[in-house]
């Protein structure tokens, strides 16, 4: 399944707020939603499916990519669900988004693809690049690159930077300080339901 490129508001109306996908928050009609839910018996499969879809759309990855991350998480030590979230959160495109250097993860991915971003002083143009503690994230020393990201930082640094990241405005430098903990995830998600969804595939 390819990466979703359709209307983003339609997705968050169905799944809830997904800050990585869009910073828009649609106004929902509470009464009609409650009535719709009360008239339907939601299956356990659907509940797991929707949690899985939240991860996929929030992080902007394909079905195959998410399944691969689940398989990696299953082989790692610790809680499969927490390891899965750590793998997704440590992607370069997500790190750029969480630092406030881009308004959304698709926006961050575009910055990486267009070679605006350096990791440890080297250009990295792979959005899925897995960052690790002590990695530094900087902007290419080019006027266009600096202008784009400075504008984003002014608009989106209002969001709190998570505990595993820091950003130095004077040096225009982000730093991964540690592997994030569960409380720093910027998404309301039940990762155990996602693991259960893939239990027969991973």
Curated annotation (Swiss-Prot):
It is found in: Plastid, Chloroplast. It comes from the Eukaryota. This is Small ribosomal subunit protein uS4c. Part of the 30S ribosomal subunit. Contacts protein S5. The interaction surface between S4 and S5 is involved in control of translational fidelity. One of its GO terms (cellular component) is chloroplast. Its main location: plastid. Keywords: Chloroplast, Plastid, Ribonucleoprotein, Ribosomal protein, RNA-binding, rRNA-binding. InterPro entries: Ribosomal_uS4, Ribosomal_uS4_bac-type, Ribosomal_uS4_CS, Ribosomal_uS4_N, S4_RNA-bd, S4_RNA-bd_sf. GO terms for molecular function: rRNA binding; structural constituent of ribosome. It comes from Rosulabryum capillare (Capillary thread-moss). CDD domains: S4. One of its GO terms (biological process) is translation. It holds the Pfam family S4. One of the primary rRNA binding proteins, it binds directly to 16S rRNA where it nucleates assembly of the body of the 30S subunit. The keyword Ribosomal protein applies. Residues 90-153 form the S4 RNA-binding domain. Belongs to the universal ribosomal protein uS4 family.
């Amino acid at each position: 399944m390819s990466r979703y490129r359709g209307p983003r508001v339609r997705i968050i109306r169905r799944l809830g707020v997904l800050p990585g996908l869009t910073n828009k928050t649609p106004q929902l009609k509470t009464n009609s939603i409650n009535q719709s839910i009360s008239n339907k018996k939601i299956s356990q499969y659907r509940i797991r499916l929707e949690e899985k879809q939240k991860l996929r759309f929030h992080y902007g990855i394909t079905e195959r990519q998410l399944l691969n991350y689940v398989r990696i998480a299953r082989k790692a030590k610790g809680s499969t669900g927490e390891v899965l979230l750590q793998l997704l959160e440590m992607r370069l495109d997500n790190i750029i988004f969480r630092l406030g250097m881009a308004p959304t993860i698709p926006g961050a991915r575009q910055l990486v693809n267009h070679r605006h971003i350096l990791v440890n002083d080297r250009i990295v143009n792979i959005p899925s690049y897995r960052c690790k503690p002590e990695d530094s994230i900087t902007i290419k020393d080019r006027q266009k690159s600096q202008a784009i990201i400075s504008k984003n930082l002014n608009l989106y640094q209002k969001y709190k930077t998570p505990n595993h990241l820091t950003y130095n405005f004077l040096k225009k430098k982000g730093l991964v300080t540690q592997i994030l903990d569960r409380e720093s995830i910027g998404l309301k998600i039940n990762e155990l339901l996602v693991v259960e969804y893939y239990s027969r595939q991973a």
